[in-house]
């Protein structure tokens, strides 16, 4: 079995889908949580000077979605063929587009600009994406694609706390089908065990 390490700050955010996937598949991994003080010295050792980073048998790789896709293949959550993988990728990329649209507003440094962008985000962007995804979940029996568990479900469940933090809301409050998607992931015994022992963090 490969030796896995996940390098990230002591937050959920983009690192949590990786931790969820490894946990889902019951693959042991070192959860290396870097402090802000440690980061400057470690930054040059990372492929692109950023995290999260996945290390597999001493080889470091970056890009959270690519790493998640790789882990999905290791834990049996990838598609059965190229078409199924395409279907999964379209959903994951949609979720990631949603994340980026939220992040652009959340990290806007100009308060006046941010206030205007928040109106569009809350009134248009968030309802659009969540309504679409909620319908997809209903059509797929409480999953995001293919009517069965895939890494799209785990990626979404893993990133959700971060999105709630950025928007300061409970995004899924009015979207029961998406709640079902997340709950199915959280009900996995291995994910449940990971959550029980992970550090408590705000984000």
Swiss-Prot record:
Reactions catalysed according to its record: RX + glutathione = an S-substituted glutathione + a halide anion + H(+)
Ranges in a coiled coil: none
EC numbers on record: 2.5.1.18
GO MF entries: glutathione transferase activity
Keywords: Transferase
Membrane-crossing residue ranges in chain numbering: none
Span of domain GST C-terminal: 81-203
Domain of life: Eukaryota
InterPro entries membership: Glutathione-S-Trfase_C-like (IPR010987), Glutathione-S-Trfase_C_sf (IPR036282), Glutathione_S-Trfase (IPR040079), Glutathione_S-Trfase_N (IPR004045), GST_C (IPR004046), GST_superfamily (IPR050213), Thioredoxin-like_sf (IPR036249)
A Pfam family the protein falls into: GST_C_3
GO biological process, one term: glutathione metabolic process
Principal EC category: transferase
Domain GST N-terminal: 2-79
Residues annotated to bind glutathione: 8, 39, 43, 49-51, 63-64
Role played: Conjugation of reduced glutathione to a wide number of exogenous and endogenous hydrophobic electrophiles.
Binding partners and assembly: Homodimer.
Family: Belongs to the GST superfamily. Sigma family.
Listed name of the protein: Glutathione S-transferase
Species of provenance: Anopheles gambiae (African malaria mosquito)
Gene of this entry: GstS1
């Amino acid at each position: 079995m490969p030796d896995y390490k996940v390098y990230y700050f002591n937050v959920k955010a983009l690192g949590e889908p990786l931790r969820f996937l490894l946990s889902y598949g019951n693959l042991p991994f070192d959860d290396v949580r870097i402090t802000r003080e440690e980061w400057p010295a470690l930054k040059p050792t990372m492929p692109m000077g950023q995290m999260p980073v996945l290390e597999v048998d001493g080889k470091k790789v970056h890009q959270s979605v690519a790493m998640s896709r790789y882990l999905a293949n290791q834990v049996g959550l990838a598609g059965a063929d190229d078409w199924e993988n395409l279907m999964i990728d379209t959903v994951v990329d949609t979720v990631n587009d949603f994340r980026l649209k939220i992040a652009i507003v959340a990290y806007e440094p100009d308060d006046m600009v941010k206030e205007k962008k928040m109106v569009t985000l809350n009134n248009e962007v968030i309802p659009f994406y969540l309504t679409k995804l909620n319908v997809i979940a209903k059509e797929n029996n409480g999953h995001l694609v293919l009517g069965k568990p895939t890494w799209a479900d785990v990626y979404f469940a893993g990133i959700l706390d971060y999105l709630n933090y950025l928007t300061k809301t409970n995004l899924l409050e009015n979207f029961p089908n998406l709640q079902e998607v997340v709950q199915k992931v959280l009900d996995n015994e291995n994910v449940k065990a990971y959550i029980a022992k992970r550090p408590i963090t705000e984000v």
